[in-house]
Amino acid sequence: MAKTYTPEEAEALVHSHDPEHPANLICDLCREFYKLGWVTGTGGGISIRKDDVVYLAPSGVQKERIKPEHIFVLPFAQSSVPKPGSKRDFIRIPSKKGLNESQCTPLFWNAFTMREAGACIHTHSQHAVLLTLLLPRDAPSFRISHQEMIKGVRLGGVGKTLKFFETLEVPIIDNTAFEEDLTEGMAAAMARYPDAPAILVRRHGVYVWGNTWEQAKTQAECLDYLFEIACKMIQNKIPLEGDT
């Protein structure tokens, strides 16, 4: 049974002087991701799971200006697994008018439930988007090997790190009109590619997860590097796999 919080206890969940507290981290990371061009125009998002509590950035806001009091807090143990349009259980809802939970919520839950991830990041990286356009339209996944930055990526996003000569494979799914409608496609791709550390969304961006926020961030950075180098390799007719 999920713990019951008083209003005071719920409010205290987003106020801490600890810079490593999830509510503070989400704000800091969103600012850093904004500088990288990953969450501009209110796009993208991040969620951190700490024990049985999930911290969630709001949707449709200036990500570089998020404050801890804007963070939504949900119990991981929901009455039902979040799905498009489903009702959510909340521990804390921000008092500021106009704030809504992230549209990425059910997709973050895919990472939490299917990979037991501790954090999930969604970016609108231009490198991710361009890569999905440069690859053949019917390509089910992105594959690359013999790149040093592969060593910063983990099997399934949460397992052992890949080796230089191993092949990284990231599935690609088609975009939908509404973010939440990606939930089923993402889950299906995660089931088909259990070793994938992320999901690319054609003409949209990428979802990346990890055991911890540190691992999710590191892998998002490594993957973005690999997406960028892959775009340049394709444009210069250099094979993505092998050491030739």
UniProtKB/Swiss-Prot annotation:
Please tell me where this protein is predominantly located: cytoplasm
Residue numbers binding substrate:
104
Q: Which cofactor does it need?
A: Zn(2+)
**InterPro entries linked:** Aldolase_II/adducin_N, Aldolase_II/adducin_N_sf, MethylthioRu-1-P_deHdtase_MtnB, Salvage_MtnB_euk
Keyword Cytoplasm belongs to the record: yes
What superkingdom does the record give? Eukaryota
Q: Where does it reside?
A: Cytoplasm
Q: How is the cofactor bound?
A: Binds 1 zinc ion per subunit.
Q: Which reaction does it catalyse?
A: 5-(methylsulfanyl)-D-ribulose 1-phosphate = 5-methylsulfanyl-2,3-dioxopentyl phosphate + H2O
Annotated Gene Ontology MF terms? Answer: methylthioribulose 1-phosphate dehydratase activity; zinc ion binding
Task: Report the GO terms under cellular component.
Answer: cytoplasm
Q: In which pathway does it act?
A: Amino-acid biosynthesis; L-methionine biosynthesis via salvage pathway; L-methionine from S-methyl-5-thio-alpha-D-ribose 1-phosphate: step 2/6
Which GO terms of type biological process are on file? L-methionine salvage from methylthioadenosine
Provide the residue positions that the database annotates as binding Zn(2+).
122, 124, 204
Query: Any idea which UniProt keywords this protein has?
Result: Amino-acid biosynthesis, Cytoplasm, Lyase, Metal-binding, Methionine biosynthesis, Zinc
Q: Per the UniProt record, which EC number(s) apply here? A: 4.2.1.109
The annotated active site, in chain numbering, is: 148 (proton donor/acceptor)
The record's NCBIfam families line, in alphabetical order, gives: salvage_mtnB
Explain the purpose of this protein: Catalyzes the dehydration of methylthioribulose-1-phosphate (MTRu-1-P) into 2,3-diketo-5-methylthiopentyl-1-phosphate (DK-MTP-1-P).
UniProt similarity note: Belongs to the aldolase class II family. MtnB subfamily.
Protein name listed in UniProt: Methylthioribulose-1-phosphate dehydratase
Which species is this UniProt entry from?
Cryptococcus neoformans var. neoformans serotype D (strain JEC21 / ATCC MYA-565) (Filobasidiella neoformans)
Q: Which gene encodes it?
A: MDE1
